[in-house]
């Protein structure tokens, strides 16, 4: 039971991280003037892509424990 609860909570966390980073990246790509305090748009976008990739990798690894 605890195993399932922990795995589910981790899955929710990683999916939320993906959603948050994807939403922010979408804003950067569609409305870059709205993010005036970040002059390094490419660096910031790269960080967001990295967050998405990391969370997706964690989800992939998590699937191994769900077997």
Regions found by a protein language model. Give the residues of each.
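Extended, charge-rich alpha-helical interface modules
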Residues: 2-67
